[in-house]
């Protein structure tokens, strides 16, 4: 059987390899234990910055659904700014949305230049609580 990682061109990696590939610490959700970590192309994540690998921390919810914490580390320019092709994220806001299948997504740029998205089959209010636990 094919794993979810192989179907989406994401590959299983160790936490150490993920940190090496992203060029810094991997963000996780405080108080939750990851199921595994994957790495894959930006093309596998809507809105991801091209030409930068995506590290995906996968969590399993109590009802067996996958919760995905995708992250890219955006390189700083000469001024220390982390340029990203998204005015909402550049302004420091977190973008929230819910897809027709009930999956809610939060996307933001943290102070260290990580573009992060958290996707889970939960209401947006619950997702907002989880976003506050990402470190």
Predicted regions and their residues:
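Short, solvent-exposed recognition patches
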Residues: 2-114, 119-132
């Amino acid at each position: 059987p094919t794993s979810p990682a192989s179907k989406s061109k994401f590959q299983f990696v160790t936490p150490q390899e993920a940190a090496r590939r992203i060029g810094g610490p991997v963000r996780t959700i405080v108080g939750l234990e990851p199921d595994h970590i994957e790495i894959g192309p930006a093309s596998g994540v809507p809105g991801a910055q091209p030409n930068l690998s995506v590290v995906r921390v996968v969590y399993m919810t109590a009802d067996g659904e996958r919760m995905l914490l995708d992250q890219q580390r955006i390189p700083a320019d000469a001024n220390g700014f982390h340029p990203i092709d998204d005015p909402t994220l550049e302004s420091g806001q977190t973008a929230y949305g819910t897809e027709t299948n009930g999956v809610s997504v939060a996307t933001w740029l943290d102070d260290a230049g990580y573009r992060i998205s958290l996707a889970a089959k939960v209401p947006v209010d619950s997702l907002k609580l989880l976003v506050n636990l990402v470190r």
